[in-house]
Amino acid sequence: MDVLFIALLVAPLILGQEYDHEEQLEEGDYYQVAYYYYTVTPNYDDFSVNFTVDYSVFESEDRLNRLNKEVTTTEAVETTASSYSLHTELMDPQNPVTTKPVTTEPVTTEPVTTEPQSPNQNDAMSTLQSPVSCFLLWTLLQGGVHFM
């Protein structure tokens, strides 16, 4: 254990030594800096990533959602109307029509109220480390001091 401790102390001293036969840099070489100027030109082709937000995708998605809602409501009306009709229609086996019943949830207009929450005294301790990890760190430090 003592050998490892000494090796850890001596290694930076050995590695940080300067040797006489090394090539030294001149002051002019040390401060010589090359400047490179470049410009970034964006490439607009079909395969590159476009970082602009295209809102038309969102608008078309909203339109599709609206149309889907309109179709489901009209299908529901047709389903209820056809269930009350007295005559039967022939089914076309090549073009089956499937209808889904539409269920709607009642909309409440009551305001949502939340109760004021009082701060808990244990909230301050939740940001600290758990006592197990603190105890483990303390035992490791005590063990390290004991072996030195």
Swiss-Prot record:
Chief place where the protein resides: secreted
InterPro entries: DUF4634
UniProt-annotated stretches for the region Disordered: 91-125
UniProt keyword Secreted, yes or no: yes
UniProt keyword terms in alphabetical order: Glycoprotein, Secreted, Signal
GO biological process terms on file: epithelial cell proliferation involved in renal tubule morphogenesis; phosphatidylinositol 3-kinase/protein kinase B signal transduction; response to wounding
Residues bearing glycans: N50
Signal sequence extent: 1-16
Entry's localization field: Secreted
GO cellular component: extracellular region
Coiled coil regions, renumbered to chain: none
Bias-annotated ranges (Low complexity): 96-116
PANTHER family named in the record: CHROMOSOME 1 OPEN READING FRAME 54, CHROMOSOME 2 C1ORF54 HOMOLOG
Protein name per Swiss-Prot or TrEMBL: Uncharacterized protein C1orf54 homolog
Organism in which the protein naturally occurs: Mus musculus
Lineage of the organism: Eukaryota, Metazoa, Chordata, Craniata, Vertebrata
